[in-house]
Design a protein with these regions (language model features):
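Proline/Glycine/Serine-rich low-complexity intrinsically disordered segments
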Residues: 2, 11, 158-161, 174, ...
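Polar, surface-exposed loop/tail segments
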Residues: 380, 420-428, 432-434, 445-480
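Active-site-proximal alpha/beta segments of enzymes that process anionic O-linked groups
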Residues: 71-328, 402, 433-434, 438-464
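A long, amphipathic alpha-helix that forms part
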Residues: 134, 283-289, 325-370, 407, ...
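Short glycine/proline-rich turn/loop motifs
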Residues: 202, 264-268, 329-339, 417-423
Length: 481
């Protein structure tokens, strides 16, 4: 196991991963056969020992007990080996684990087999994405939007946003801009995963759930922007280019951001170090933009640490606004009220960060798309905090899979791109899932290629609003009750 994260992530949430390409699936079979042989040898010697020590009746009791336990565990083992051998992608493996297909992984050997299977899938996926991305080309580009900004929030429960009806003032700057008619707030947006790394893979890939071919056959969208002459800059407070040494990568999604060749192909620039608070990341953005001067076409991707646990570490003490007394009417234990207050403070500080991003682009011909990767349980519909990695109920999906998405246009952009502004304005009630986020960005840029699909862009007249929105790759969000 290799820990692929920085010191901050280690202190907040310890995660271990496997990252090696030397094992393939046939070696999993060999290991399993060796394990089976050892198991048979053990039972053979156990049987001989029983025959010497115990009379026939006791032997029958032991055999019956072992047989009963075998039958009891058999369904879990069948599901486990289905997980091991019938799943084709890393996303499918994770989706099946949330349906308890890994329940049979009760021993270190089982977990080793599963880890090797995940490693094999990941290696194959990375190779395929490499090829699809590096070979991708465009047909044309009108540069409809010269400066596009994608802001990706982290662990944002939209139901704790004043913008979406939360009673406390967690987003005063956004609320003020919305009241002034500056924001186009989308009402019905969901994410396919409640795991950041998987969301990144889904959002960056031009593949979406429902495509016949697997995700490895599709390129990552930033390459099309680079082919079109955009300078693509990636500012992240989580995924840093130096991978193991400086930032975080992840087998199941963010791994492509840790690949040097792929990263260089996708981005003209990436920041080299994270900032403790998100406002520090915005300072890095400003310093870089000032250093390079005017660039005709840019795509800036800004990835915040947002409201990632631990909530109290996401804002400076001077930004503390809410206290446990603000939640007295909910009759919660003080410990829970304190956590909610910290989360709401992180959300309010995030609002300040977002407003500083808007201010930075206010005088450019720019459009900003804000979306969060996933939500979070904060003692609302369910008496829990964090995320539940299981097949979701409707209540869980409301908190963890519904995400905020809004679009802001600068005064110059509103003046020169009235058609797009009108299309955005008329689309805010469209149901949308962010695995098609790349299609929205391609539409805004006017990029045409074999990968462009206007039926997946929520502001296009060709948009297919009836497409199933599958979370975990299996569960239809709109059919949850």
């Amino acid at each position: 196991m290799i820990v692929q994260t920085d010191g901050r992530e280690i202190s907040d949430f310890l995660t271990t991963y496997v990252n090696t390409s030397i094992f393939m699936r046939w070696k999993i079979v060999v290991l399993f056969l060796l394990f089976a042989i050892l198991l048979l040898m053990f039972f053979y010697h156990f049987q001989l020992d029983c025959e010497k020590r115990f009379p026939r009746a006791y032997q029958m009791i032991i055999i019956s007990l072992i047989s009963f336990l075998f039958v009891l565990e058999l369904p879990n083992q069948v599901k486990f080996f289905k997980l091991l051998f019938s799943s084709d992608t890393i996303q499918e493996i994770e989706g099946m684990t949330f349906q308890n297909y890994d329940k049979g992984a009760a021993t270190p050997m089982h977990r080793l087999l599963l880890s090797l299977s995940v490693t094999s899938h990941t290696d194959n996926l990375l190779r395929n994405i490499h090829q699809a991305t590096l070979e991708a080309e465009i047909d044309s580009c009108s540069h409809e939007s010269p400066h596009i900004v994608l802001v990706i929030g982290e662990t944002y429960n939209k139901h704790h946003s004043q913008l979406y009806g939360y009673p406390l003032q967690t987003t005063p700057y956004q609320a003020q801009r919305n009241a002034a008619g500056e924001l186009f707030v989308f009402k019905d947006v969901v994410t396919p995963w409640n795991i950041t790394s998987n969301v990144f893979t889904s959002a960056f890939s031009l593949w979406h759930y429902g495509d016949i071919e697997s995700i490895g056959h599709y390129p990552l969208f930033p390459i099309l922007f680079k082919r079109a002459g955009y300078q693509v800059r990636f500012f992240s407070n989580q995924y840093i280019q130096d991978g193991l040494l400086r930032g975080g990568t992840n087998l199941s999604g963010g791994f492509f951001l840790g690949d040097e060749v792929l990263s260089d192909s996708l981005f003209n620039y990436r920041n080299e170090s994270p900032s403790y608070f998100d406002m520090g990341l915005i300072r890095q953005l400003r310093e870089y933009v000032d250093s390079v001067g005017n660039v005709p076409y840019t795509l800036d991707i800004i990835h915040l640490i947002g409201q990632h646990f631990s909530y109290k570490k996401r804002y400076p003490r001077s930004a503390e606004y809410f206290h446990i007394t603000d939640y007295k009417s909910r009759h919660l234990p003080n410990e829970q009220s304190e956590l909610i207050a910290a989360y709401d403070n992180a959300t309010r500080y995030n609002d300040l960060v977002i407003d500083s991003i808007i201010t930075h682009y206010e005088h450019d011909d720019a459009i900003i798309v804000y979306v969060a990767d996933h939500g979070e349980e904060v003692f609302d519909d369910l008496p829990v905090r964090g995320r539940l990695f299981q097949e979701p109920s409707k209540r869980q999906a409301n908190q963890e899979f519904e995400v905020p998405l809004w679009i802001w246009c600068s005064p110059a952009y509103r003046s020169s791109h009235r058609k797009i502004v009108d299309e955005i304005k008329s689309s805010v009630n469209q149901p949308f899932m962010i695995d098609d986020l790349s299609q929205l960005l391609l539409y805004l840029a006017g990029i045409h290629s074999k990968w462009t699909n206007h039926s997946c862009c929520p502001i296009s007249k060709e948009y297919n609003s009836s497409r199933p929105r599958l979370i975990y790759g299996k569960v239809d969000y709109d059919k949850l009750k």
